[in-house]
Amino acid sequence: FEFVIDLEPGTEPVCKRPYKLRPEELEELKKQLDEQERMGLIRLSSSPWGCGVLFVNNKDGTERLYIDYRPLNKKTIKNKYPLPNINELFDQLKGAKVFSKLDLCMGYHQMRILEQDIPKTAFRTSCGSYEYTVMSFGLVNAPPMFSRIMNFIFNPYTNDFDRVYLDDILVFPKNKEDHAKHLRLVLDKLREHQFYAEFSKCEFWLHEV
């Protein structure tokens, strides 16, 4: 699977000046850029595109690098694939006796971007220009695209014992006896399509969610 960024006809590259960051943010920026480059998520860029960067707070108090892709998103042809309905999901859980919850490791980052579209993801910082080689948070079509891929992968089990909400997977058989078997089927599907769960964030054999 590859992520594609289709633009409106006649779109010209947009390049913004780097946003001003506080000294402590600059230090965190260098740290996160080094880490993401080491992991192969980003690379140096000479693209004519360039969006600004800022930081958002995570629930655990840490800061996450966030690319302000609004100029790119404005020119992107929108993917209309529907996102999961959380209320519908909870309705489906009625009668389930046991649950397991799988959290994909850096979910969006597990999907590569089509090579010719990588330059469109470029962002500018005081440390230089970079571009993503994998799907990034902030891209307007990332949620619907990821949802479509997950639904394609798990379609045989959806509405039976498995539901996916973006990068979270819930396994919920109606009886405990089938749970281990169903969990193995879901894990086998992840392995088949080379998606990986983050074990430390997964929870197994829960009695409520």
Predicted regions and their residues:
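Retroelement reverse transcriptase polymerase core
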Residues: F1-V209
